[in-house]
A protein has these predicted regions:
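N-terminal, positively charged/glycine-rich alpha-helical extensions of SAM-dependent methyltransferases
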Residues: 2-27
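Class I SAM-dependent methyltransferase Rossmann-like catalytic core
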Residues: 25-38
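Conserved alpha-helix/loop element of class I SAM-dependent methyltransferases that forms part
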Residues: 36-55
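Class I SAM-dependent methyltransferase SAM/SAH-binding core
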Residues: 60-62, 66-116
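A short acidic, Gly/Pro-enriched loop at the edge of an enzyme's catalytic core
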Residues: 115-126
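A short beta-strand submotif of the Rossmann-like class I SAM-dependent methyltransferase core
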Residues: 129
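A short, conserved alpha-helix within the catalytic core of class I
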Residues: 135-145
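Conserved small/polar residues in nucleotide/adenosyl-binding loops
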Residues: 153-154
């Protein structure tokens, strides 16, 4: 059965309700390297501003999709990476991609929602969300997710 969402818009006195099958999104993006804008070069440029990651570092990639940027991160950082995405089909592909690159020992994908994280507070060394934070709003994401980062004393 298709998973459907109802979107309600209320702008300028025009109320609309639209239903769409989110499986269309999965089908469209499943076989692409990335589910949004970006490139390996853009990922590496952003990563160049991050210091002090170690083999003990815990990294989360929120809204990871099939893991295009996550695999680039894994190939250029130590530590463990958990990719989180709402779509199970993306996570299945994510885990296959990690296995193909022999990264499965430190890179795993899990199904979840970026607005209800299952990580413990102050447990992560880095939160990555390349082109996905807009799903819950940039300001909201920054405000909520910072609680999951380790304090600077750790």
């Amino acid at each position: 059965m298709p998973q459907c969402f109802t979107i309600m818009n209320n702008d300028n006195n025009h109320n609309t309700i639209q239903e769409f099958d989110v499986n269309l999104i999965c089908d469209f993006f499943l076989n692409t390297n990335r589910q949004g804008p970006g490139s390996p070069e853009a990922t590496l440029k952003a990563l160049s501003f991050i210091n002090n990651l170690t083999v003990q570092s815990l990294i989360a990639d929120l809204g990871c999709g099939t893991g295009g940027q996550t695999m680039v991160l894994a190939q250029h950082t130590p530590g463990s990476i958990t990719g989180l995405d709402f779509f199970p089909e993306f996570i299945e592909c994510f885990n296959r991609n990690a296995e193909k690159l022999n990264l499965q020992d430190r890179v795993k994908g899990v199904v979840g929602s970026m607005d209800a994280l299952s990580f413990e507070k102050e447990s992560l060394d880095l939160i990555w969300s390349e082109g996905a934070i807009y799903n819950i709003g940039f300001e909201r994401g920054l405000n909520e997710w910072r609680n999951y980062l380790r304090s600077e004393e750790h």
